[in-house]
């Protein structure tokens, strides 16, 4: 049990939003809040173009944000700031940006935010399409549940876990107390799947949610070595250096 993850093991938060989409704070504010947490790296992952309700980024705005992140990176030595996206997996299974756009980002998350009522087969087709894309590193809140509000889109968990393992796609424990998705039971049952614990912060205060995600992981006996945001600054840089996840 000595290797079970603790809050002190977390070296960065890699899913968060800014005023570019539906977040409350600028990139700079988020950077300073992450530095205040003592983090060594962070990824800015605003919503993608089809999620209009969340002010999703058209390609041109995404690339403009990318430039702003590069400038801020030169300014702040104490943290590495990476460009990313929380990209929608569309109802037909296609992804919200083309690969040539994804190639320009440091880190790509994919997520389902619409058409939750599809059949399990259709949902799995969407998730499979995302997992098999060479740029998609991780799937956010993999069941889509909101505690007390909606059950989510009911993927076939067994299939999703096999798929994640096969394609080396990371699955998220979303630390927002309304989500806690994946939950402790799932991460305990599938010990080989790589994880990341993130706050999905839409406000600087939300960075404090990390403790709920870590508590969920602890309940699921998750060891530190399964969670990619426990990597050191250097190792995380190496991990995402070539942008494309390694294909078996």
Residues covered by each model-derived region:
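Conserved SAM-binding loop
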Residues: 22
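Charged catalytic cores and adjacent phosphate/nucleic-acid-binding surfaces used
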Residues: 1-18, 27-44, 49-79, 91-248
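Active-site catalytic microenvironments in core metabolic enzymes, especially phosphate/sugar-handling
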Residues: 84-87, 212
């Amino acid at each position: 049990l000595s290797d079970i993850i603790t809050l002190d093991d977390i070296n960065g938060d890699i899913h968060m939003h800014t005023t570019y989409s539906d977040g409350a704070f600028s990139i700079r504010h988020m950077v300073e809040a992450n530095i205040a947490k003592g983090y060594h790296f962070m990824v800015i992952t605003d919503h993608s173009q089809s999620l209009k309700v969340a002010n999703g980024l058209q390609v041109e705005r995404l690339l403009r944000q990318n430039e702003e992140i590069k400038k801020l990176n030169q300014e702040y030595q104490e943290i590495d700031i990476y460009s990313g996206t929380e990209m929608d997996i569309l109802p037909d299974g296609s992804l919200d940006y083309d690969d040539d756009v994804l190639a320009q980002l440091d880190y790509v998350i994919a997520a389902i935010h619409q058409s939750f009522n599809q059949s399990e087969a259709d949902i799995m087709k969407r998730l499979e399409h995302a997992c098999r894309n060479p740029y998609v590193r991780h799937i956010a809140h993999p069941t889509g549940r909101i505690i007390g509000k909606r059950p989510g889109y009911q993927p076939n968990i067994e299939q999703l876990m096999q798929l994640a393992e096969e394609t080396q796609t990371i699955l998220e424990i979303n630390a927002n107390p309304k989500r806690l998705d994946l939950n402790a039971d799932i991460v305990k049952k599938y010990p080989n799947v790589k994880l990341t614990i993130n706050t999905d912060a839409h406000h600087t205060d939300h960075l404090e949610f990390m403790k709920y995600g870590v508590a969920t992981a602890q309940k699921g006996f998750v060891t530190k070595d399964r969670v990619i945001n426990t990597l050191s600054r250097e190792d995380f840089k190496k991990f995402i250096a070539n942008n494309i996840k390694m294909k078996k």
